[in-house]
Structure formats: structure tokens, C-alpha cells
């Protein structure tokens, strides 16, 4: 109990410091398609219509992007997805509706396991099924990063995140630019530089790093920043978070990946509770 109170106190301090068409098979609600490899779904605007983003009178905030057909790909020209296929349809005479899902494990809101960019961890079997659920669930701090820079060592230092804070969600210019709502990949997204990642590892107790685009690492530091984070197996990266219209501050975070044995990544459902 004392440890929990201390963690919450540290988060309070951190907030103060950090302020600176198979047509017959498909419909608008349940899309279908006639080619096994075709992407199918409703447009983003239509998909968003009627979707719940808050629950419990605004107490619970869903910070997971819907897995819609026009999710952004990481890089321009990359395969987009996920692909949802209504394989069996009652509208076509079957006794049930049955969909299939085909997607990359690093699409949309997702988690990186340590083996994503560390072969030693991958060979040791450190997959998403072995991620620490205690770390994925608990008090978290949502901060706004400086908007004129990647997350460098200088930017990290300016956030004044105190020791003891284990989970931080970083909202960046990516949210302002609504990059997760654009189908085409955009390599000018904001992320951690190598020195920013190293500063976090060396100077904080943060073990869960969340960010608002498909990669926690800036494109020019794509490999090197990941290597810094994954040098040790106790840091979890959650990417592609939907942080639009969420106030900076302290929340209870709950994130649950799929139990994909042998996979270095997984779709993940994340919510914040005020």
C-alpha cells in the first residue's frame, strides 16, 4: 500500500513538472469482399461514427485505434490492413456469420516484445505471451512533448519526469497532425532519437513507453533507438496509441495484448481510467 501511494505521489509531481465487395456478404456495418487478399471495410469517417471512445460517463477512455481497413501503413507503399473478411455470411445462406482477420502484428495500436529487435531475446522465447501484465497495467503519466523536435535527450530532460515513475505515454506532434488517421505512411513522424532513448534508460525508472504513432523511434533512428530500449528485456513499447482529446495527467492504464506464442508483436487494447 505504501509503495502504491508513493507511486501515485510521484505521478502527481510528474504532472506538475511536465506541463510546460462480395456485395451480398457485406454491409456498412459488416463489410465483405470477393478476393481473399483484398482490403475491405468502411471509410475511416464511417467507421468512427457510432463508435464508443468513452465509457462510464467519461471515466474510461479508449486509447486504442479501431482496426479498420484504412489504418496507416508504416511506410509509403507498404501493405495496409488489417484485412477483415466475412468468410461465411447469413445473408448468403449460411447459418452463421464468420469473419477472418489477417494483419501484420505491428499494425495499429500494438505492443513490441523485446525480441522485435534483439535476436538474443527472440531466441530465448521472450515473446508477447511472456510480457509482464503487471507492467502493462497500473498508474501512468501522459505527457506532452516539445512540439518542435524529436524526443531527444534534451527533450527528455525538459520533461522533468521524476524517479519512480514506471509508465509514461508520450503525446507528440503526431497527434496534432493526426498521422494515425491518414492511410499513407509518413516517415516525418516524431519519435525517440538514439540519445533520447539512452537518456530515458539511464536517467529514469520508466519501463513502459507509449507513443502516438506506429514506431516509438524516429525514422532516422529506427534501429538504433529500438536497440537501446531492447538491450535489456524489461522495457515494453506500446505504439500507435490514440491520444486525441485526452488531457495530460495521471491515469490508471490497462493494456492487454493477445497471447501470441512465438510473436514479437501483437495488437493491444489499451484504456485509461481517470
Swiss-Prot record:
Q: Which gene encodes it?
A: CYL1
User: Which family does this protein fall into?
Assistant: Belongs to the Cyclase 1 superfamily.
- Leader peptide range in chain numbering: 1-18
Subcellular compartments: Secreted, Extracellular space, Extracellular matrix
Q: Which organism is it from?
A: Oryza sativa subsp. japonica (Rice)
Q: Does the keyword Signal apply?
A: yes
What GO MF terms are annotated? arylformamidase activity
Per the record, the domain of life is: Eukaryota
What's this protein's function?
May be involved in response to stresses.
Q: What is this protein called?
A: Cyclase-like protein 1
